[in-house]
């Protein structure tokens, strides 16, 4: 990231193994008020989730090794209120209900919906901070 990040920036862990998609998405979502950490597989992402605090996990479903849904399930097991966006070209809606209410499925080609989801998460976090929820 070239810009200095806001200390209150939305902390996003983005997991994607396809370099072209990864680079395009990072370019679209990274900004001064968003800090994006990128991983290419679920195991590396899990290590990041253990070492740092993130507001949202954005992950592809089909990854080398463990799937993005397995990663999400593992992270949510520690706190079901965490936010997850499954950003994938695969149809995984059947698994969505089992992951919880804070998980959204967004098709990979829908960058506008990804942006809307990140804005909504930021607004929710700001509201919670003001109400101390």
Report each predicted region and the residues it spans.
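Non-catalytic signal-transmission and effector/linker regions of two-component phosphorelay proteins
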Residues: 1-13, 104, 110-133
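Two-component/phosphorelay signaling modules centered on CheY-like receiver
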Residues: 18-37
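Acidic, metal-coordinating helix/loop segments flanking the phosphotransfer/catalytic sites
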Residues: 38-56, 116
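Acidic catalytic/metal-coordinating carboxylates
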Residues: 41, 67-70
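Active-site residues of response regulator receiver
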Residues: 60
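The feature encodes the CheY-like receiver
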Residues: 64
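Short amphipathic alpha-helix used as the core "switch/output" element in two-component signaling
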Residues: 69-81
């Amino acid at each position: 990231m070239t810009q200095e990040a806001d200390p209150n920036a939305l902390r996003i862990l983005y997991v994607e193994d396809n370099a072209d998609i990864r680079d395009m998405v990072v370019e679209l979502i990274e900004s001064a008020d968003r800090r994006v950490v990128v991983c290419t597989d679920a195991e590396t992402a899990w290590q990041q989730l253990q070492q740092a605090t993130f507001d949202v996990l954005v992950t592809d479903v089909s990854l080398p090794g463990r799937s993005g849904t397995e990663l999400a399930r593992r992270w949510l097991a520690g706190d079901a209120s965490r936010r997850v966006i499954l950003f994938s070209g695969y149809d995984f809606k059947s698994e969505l209900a089992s992951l919880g209410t804070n998980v959204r499925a967004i098709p990979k080609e829908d960058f506008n919906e990804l942006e809307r989801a990140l804005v909504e998460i930021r607004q929710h976090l700001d509201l919670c901070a003001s109400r101390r929820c």
